[in-house]
Amino acid sequence: MTGVQTCALPISGLYEIRIGTNILYTDAKGDFILQGELIDTRARRNLTEERVEKLTAIKFDELPLKNALMQVRGKGERKLAIFEDPNCHYCHKLEKEIATLDNVAIYTFLIPILGENSVEKAKNIWCAKDRLTTWSQWMVHEKEPAAATCDTAAITANLELARANNITGTPTLVFTDGTRIPGAAPLRRIEELLTASAKK
């Protein structure tokens, strides 16, 4: 248990319990625990979902962008960070999906969480002379990255960053307003979130 929240709940006598980013509810004595979502039917809002989104928000400005592959398309006025594993099927799908995104700076944090082969591929990509081309060739065209060696402390740091922010799956997209989307979102949704986060 990481904390008990005793405020901002609209029901008297109901308290929030947080376990990581999971939310449970209890009474004042802790005799009962309720697992599920708290819905405000009048406002048609899922209060549990809103709370989890707030708890999992990532401060984009604090991301160590030097540890990411950076790709600028057009003016790069919009920004997007993506945590990806080179062997993740949905990451491959996402890379093909976002190929047409324009006016965006994309920061890809390599987090090889799917086994030793992922670690090897991530290192080969990070150590390549042309990281972006090597990444794109592998993710979009399935061209195996050539063996390469260099300092891979950035990959270790990325894994620690993912753990600290409870990023347990790939891809995970992070927008400048802190919004986090797990999974390969459709292009239309990504465009909407890029536009919305740029206005905040």
Regions found by a protein language model. Name each.
Residues 21-50, 163-164, 169-170, 174-200:
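Non-catalytic, surface beta->alpha helical segment in thiol-disulfide oxidoreductase systems
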Residues 59-78, 100:
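A short beta-strand-turn-helix
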Residues 2-9:
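Short, small-residue-biased leader/transition segments that mark boundaries at the very start
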Residues 49-62, 171:
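C-terminal low-complexity, charged extensions that often adopt amphipathic alpha-helices
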